[in-house]
Design a protein with these regions (language model features):
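Low-complexity, intrinsically disordered P/S/T-rich segments
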Residues: 1-223
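Flexible hinge/switch segments at interdomain interfaces of large molecular machines
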Residues: 67-87, 119-127, 217, 225, ...
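The Walker A (P-loop) glycine that initiates the GxxxxGKT/S ATP-binding motif of P-loop NTPases
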Residues: 163, 228, 277, 511
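Hydrophobic positions on the alpha1 helix immediately C-terminal to the Walker A/P-loop
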Residues: 237, 241
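P-loop NTPase motor-domain active sites and their immediate coupling elements
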Residues: 137, 169, 174-202, 209, ...
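Walker A (P-loop) phosphate-binding loop of P-loop NTPases
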Residues: 220, 230-231
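Conserved lysine of the Walker
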Residues: 234
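P-loop NTPase switch/communication element
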Residues: 219, 246-284, 288-289, 390
Length: 559
């Protein structure tokens, strides 16, 4: 009986609990059916679950910043949170150190009979510039001749004297900082200079001596040459250029062609939507890609002529107007994207196919600007046989990183100075239109940051769509080049001649056909490749390996 009584009490308590849960705000429970109680419980659960979902969504949105969408496009710009941010401050006694150095500099110059007044101190990320005004009658050349003495008295690793500073009545002496500050790429991307920059080809270069953000327009450069010794910061500079474009332009606006004979620097970008074709690592294919760009440039100019415009901006504006008015179908005639061709190591290409590569680069650099095609060329061997006079004359904008000698510096920027740079992104930035190069500390971006951005783009783009037409043209060019190693016009006659004489030598071919040594040597090599004559045997004539009948059979089959 006791257990039954306990069960009844438990059931009564449960009913009271249910009624309490179903009660309205005033505590009234009368007139509520069982079904209504159940429905109200379900609705309460729904409200709780919805609130939970909303909270989760808000938490995720707080973790990942707004992903800006390109106007009318599906491209989602990568968030800046994928990049590293680091607060860096100078030590408390640094201002005092700068004043002491300025005083020491002034005293050093006075000891050599040069009186100067320090007018300004500009502290940059890696270098501090002391601006000074010499007294009347002091020759600038005298200050320049004291470079080594200043270096000795200040115990500086290296100094650079800019005399005079462009636009100022002052001389600048640049001295390396005790502690260098890293310029992170995110600092440049988040700066108002970059955000307000209108061009789709904005390039966040770095920070100048005054600590100002330097952003330039690749479209106005219009081609760029980057050179410097190994490990000076060229590849990082190329990465900052590519990442600047990824943060500024959609794939419909800018397309990239990357040539990377080193195979390791740019391959990480395979799969991003901006790539026109996969990263080219074969130097032979690279010349094909450049030749395709020349053909594309010619094709674009034909379209400009047909539509009566002068450049890519005019063409795209006209297409937009015609699309709005409904005169043309947006699917059949589209806007032209700007194309940036990035070559990471020119020296490798110049070794494989110097003639073709140089011709293509010169043609593109002379004519491609208005067609919206821009070249970025990097090399670690700034010698005259890599950066030829023709290439230099047609690529007006330059970036010089640290090099070993003044000769290399003059090859890149036509003046000394790059040999005094510190390395690790320290550069002389010399775009078209500047009277003198500007010293800039290049931005740093790590491999992990690049990987994160590339992965983000791949996730949001599903599958990278490459232009198969371009790839096929490059492959066809390569295959036709391999097949069309055409035989010399004297090949048949020479083959019959050597079989008749039963021996073959370059001298025999020269005398018989009245050709030069090089051509005769090529004919003999072709005969050897065809299996008609044997290999070289020192100074002896080559052996003939075919009979007349075999030769005729060979001609029938292959020629």
């Amino acid at each position: 009986i006791d257990s039954e009584t306990a069960n009844v009490e438990t059931m009564t308590n449960e009913v009271v609990d249910i009624n309490n849960e179903a009660a309205d705000n005033e505590g009234n429970v009368s007139g509520i059916s069982d079904n209504e109680v159940i429905e109200s419980e379900v609705k309460d659960n729904e409200i709780i679950s919805n609130e939970t979902v909303v909270k989760e969504i808000k938490a995720k949105e707080a973790a990942v910043p707004d992903r800006k969408k390109a106007e009318g496009k599906d491209y989602i710009f990568p968030p800046v949170t994928l990049l590293i941010k680091e607060q860096q401050t100078q030590s408390s006694g640094y201002e005092q150190y700068l004043k002491e150095t300025a005083l020491k500099l002034q005293q050093t110059l006075e000891s050599f009979g040069v009186n100067v007044t320090i007018t300004d101190i500009s502290c940059g990320p890696s270098v501090t510039r002391y601006e000074m005004f010499p007294e009347q009658g002091t020759k600038v050349s005298k200050i320049l001749s004291l470079t080594d003495d200043i270096k000795l008295n200040l115990a500086a690793s290296d100094i650079r004297i800019e005399a005079p500073i462009p636009g100022k009545a002052a001389i600048g002496i640049e001295i390396p900082n005790k502690h260098n500050q890293t310029v992170h790429f995110r600092d440049l991307i988040e700066s108002s200079t970059f955000e307000k920059f209108k061009s789709r080809l904005a390039f966040a270069v770095g920070k100048d001596i005054g600590g100002k953000t330097v952003v330039t327009d690749l479209a106005k450069m219009p081609h760029l040459l980057i050179a410097g010794a190994t490990g000076s910061g060229k590849s990082v500079c190329i990465n900052t250029l590519i990442m600047s474009i990824l943060y500024k332009a959609s794939p419909e606006e800018v397309k990239l062609i990357m040539v990377d004979p080193k195979m390791v620097e740019l391959s990480i970008y395979n799969g991003i939507p901006h790539l026109l074709i996969p990263v080219v690592t074969d130097p032979k294919k690279a010349s094909g890609a450049l030749n395709w760009a020349v053909a594309e440039m010619t094709n674009r100019y034909k379209k400009f002529t047909e539509t009566g415009v002068r450049n890519i901006e005019g063409y795209n504006k006209k297409v937009k107007e015609l699309q709005k008015s409904g005169e043309i179908d947006p699917e059949t005639i589209k806007k032209m994207p700007q194309i940036v061709i990035i070559i990471d190591e020119l020296a490798d290409l110049m070794m494989v196919a110097p003639g073709e590569v140089e011709d293509a680069i010169v043609r593109l650099s002379q004519l491609a600007r208005a067609a919206g095609i821009h070249l970025v060329i990097a090399t670690q061997r700034p010698s005259v046989n890599v950066i030829t006079g023709l290439i230099k004359a047609n690529v007006p904008s330059r970036i010089a990183f640290s090099v070993s000698s003044g000769v290399d510096s003059r090859t890149i920027i036509d003046m000394n100075g790059a040999e005094k740079l510190l390395g690790k992104g320290d550069m002389l930035f010399y775009p078209a239109g500047y009277s003198k190069p500007v010293r800039v500390q290049g931005a740093f971006i790590s491999d992990s940051e690049i990987s994160d951005v590339v992965e983000f783009l791949k996730e949001n783009e599903d599958v990278a769509v490459y232009d198969t037409e371009v790839t096929e043209k490059i492959e066809n060019k390569l295959n036709s080049a391999a097949i069309s190693q055409e035989k010399d016009e004297y090949f048949e006659a020479a083959a019959r001649f050597v079989i008749e004489k039963d021996k073959a030598s370059i001298g025999m071919i020269q005398r018989m056909f009245k050709v030069g040594f090089n051509r005769a040597a090529r004919i003999v090599d072709q005969l050897a490749d065809a299996g008609i004559v044997g290999p070289e045997e020192g100074t002896k004539p080559r052996k003939v390996l075919m009979s007349s009948e075999q030769l005729e059979a060979y001609f029938e089959e292959y020629l």
